[in-house]
């Protein structure tokens, strides 16, 4: 529907300050979301910052006002929804609701379905292939590069920061943990 409206009404495609607001706001969300996800104090904060990142990607796609960007943004929103559902399912199996990174340590070995769910959700947020986030981010990245190469260069640091934060989460899921033996009362 949105794509049809964009092709029927040319005045929707005129360059306005609103378009620049969408693009700059989305770029800020991508970079800030990636940086905050890398420095997240808890896994719950990580997923909140990952949602900021993925929302920023979608806003940039919509802000480009081209068919490729709008299609990528729609796919990014579908990816975000599915990643949230999978992450919620993974967190249901985590003891203490994952209030600390130590709660996730070794989760991939002790509760494999929860570890896989959290790993897949993290990879979806960061747009790793073959998940739906990758084609969404690729379409938006290509549309940004076609519109102005500097936009693509500005998206890249946020993507790299998010990828690094995903590796942090994945390492936490598979590395051996101490468990909760340190808290066992005598």
PLM feature segments, named:
Residues 185-186:
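Glycine- and aromatic-enriched alpha-helical transmembrane segments of multi-pass membrane proteins
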Residues 1-138, 142-173, 179:
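Hydrophobic transmembrane alpha-helices and their helix-loop junctions in integral membrane proteins
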């Amino acid at each position: 529907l949105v794509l049809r409206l964009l092709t029927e009404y040319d005045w929707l495609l005129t360059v306005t300050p609103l378009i620049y607001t969408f693009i700059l706001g989305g770029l800020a969300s991508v970079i800030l979301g990636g940086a905050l996800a890398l420095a997240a104090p808890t896994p719950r904060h990580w997923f909140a910052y990952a949602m900021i990142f993925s929302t920023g990607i979608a806003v940039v796609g919509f802000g480009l006002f081209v068919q490729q960007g709008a299609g990528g943004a729609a796919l990014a929103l579908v990816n975000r929804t599915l990643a949230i559902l999978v992450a919620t399912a993974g967190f249901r199996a985590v003891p203490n609701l994952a209030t600390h990174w130590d709660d996730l340590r070794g989760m991939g070995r002790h509760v494999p379905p929860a570890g896989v769910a959290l790993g897949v959700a993290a990879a979806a947020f960061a747009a790793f292939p073959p998940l739906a986030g990758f084609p969404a981010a690729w379409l938006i990245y290509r549309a940004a590069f076609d519109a102005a190469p500097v936009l693509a260069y500005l998206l890249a640091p946020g993507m790299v920061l998010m990828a690094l934060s995903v590796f942090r989460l994945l390492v936490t899921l598979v590395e051996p943990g101490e468990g909760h033996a340190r808290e066992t009362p005598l």
